[in-house]
Every structure is written in C-alpha cells, then in structure tokens.
C-alpha cells in the first residue's frame, strides 16, 4: 500500500458508510434490531479497515507524506462521524428499538450491542438541540 492509495480508500469508505446509513434511515419498516441495529453494527467496515491500517502505520513509522494525509483526512472523518452520531432520523430508529427492547426477544449479546449503540449516540450528542449540535460540530472540528 502506497501513501497515494489512502485518500481514495478513505473517500470510498466514507461513501460506502454514508450509503449504508442512508439505507437504514430509508427503511420504511418499523425499526427493529434486525433492520436497524444489526446493519448499523456492520456498517462502515471498509472505512474501519482503512483507518485501522493507516493509524497503525502512522503510529509505527510516520513520515511527512503520511502526516499530510492524516491532517487532510482528520476533519473529514470528524465530519463524517458527526453526521452519523448527530443524525436525528437515525437516532430516532435506534431509540425506538431501545425503548422496545423488551419486546424484541433479544439475547444477551444483542441486548449489549443495542445498549452500546444507544449510549454511544447519547454520549456523542444525539439528544442535544439542533443549536447545541451545531456548537458541538464546531468544537469537534
């Protein structure tokens, strides 16, 4: 893998992740673990892999070219993840599943995954007002 391969890989990972999140939001069925939490759990795999490889490399053996890529991709990743964690439509689906978790007949692992996603979104600002979300976005960038 050469340094010039990273930005296109990051951009494709972001594009795929955006499409996966959009599909979850666009699902016309009532939110369930199967149609909301499960696809959320497995979304963004390419982006995660690219980021893991890139981060490992920059921590182990960095150079000016890799540092320039890191500087360029960092705000894009922050914006991308803010767009997910502060997305009201996505959080509404997660919250519905969370509030109906006792009706879902989830096993222990599924319950833990659901709770983790719900808490992660809350901690990331999903319950903030739109004004406060905008402020948080500014702080994050």
Regions found by a protein language model. Name each.
Residues 1-141:
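Zn2+-dependent metallopeptidase catalytic domains
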């Amino acid at each position: 893998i050469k340094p010039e391969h990273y930005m296109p890989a990051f951009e494709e990972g972001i594009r795929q992740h955006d499409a996966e999140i959009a599909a979850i939001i666009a699902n016309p069925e009532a939110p369930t673990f199967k149609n909301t939490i499960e696809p959320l759990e497995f979304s963004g795999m390419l982006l995660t892999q690219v980021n893991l490889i890139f981060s490992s490399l920059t921590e182990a053996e960095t150079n000016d070219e890799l540092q320039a890529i890191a500087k360029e991709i960092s705000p894009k990743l922050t914006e991308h993840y803010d767009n997910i964690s502060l997305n009201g439509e996505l959080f509404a689906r997660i919250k519905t599943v969370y509030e109906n978790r006792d009706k879902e007949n989830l096993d222990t692992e599924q319950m833990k995954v659901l709770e983790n996603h719900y808490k992660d979104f809350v901690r990331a600002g999903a319950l903030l007002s739109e004004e406060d979300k905008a402020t948080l976005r500014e702080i994050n960038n």
